[in-house]
Amino acid sequence: IFFMEQTKSLIEAIIQGIQEKKGKEITTVDLHHIVTAPCSCFVICTCGSPQQVSAVCDSVEEFTRKLVQQKPSAIAGRQNGLWVAMDYGTVMVHIFLEEARGYYELEKLWDDAELTQYPDID
């Protein structure tokens, strides 16, 4: 995946934050070459409960603040526990409850996007 160093470090911090709270099915969607895409990359993960969605969101915030000194410009959906979207400018984080991820299938929106899957950590 081609990303500027700063974006790469941000993605790594996001993934660590997700893994810290046992987020599953972590996938990055490389959108940097797609003109109509809203950002360079999506980081998507699945959670088993609304409480875990919230915990992963908090963890991602903590890890990005500590490791790369970045805060999201916006966080949407925090109250509902189904789908939280975190906007880091070049990177958007999508934290889904299992049913919501299956329903929205964000990974499939761009056919020519490169997907990278990360192993689940137990």
Q: How should each PLM-predicted stretch be described?
A:
Residues 2-39, 47-84, 98-100, 109-122:
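Polybasic/polar functional segments that serve as interface/processing modules
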Residues 40, 90:
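Conserved acidic residues
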Residues 103-104:
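Glycine/threonine-rich flexible loop motifs
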Residues 86-88:
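Active-site beta-strand termini and strand-to-loop segments that position acidic
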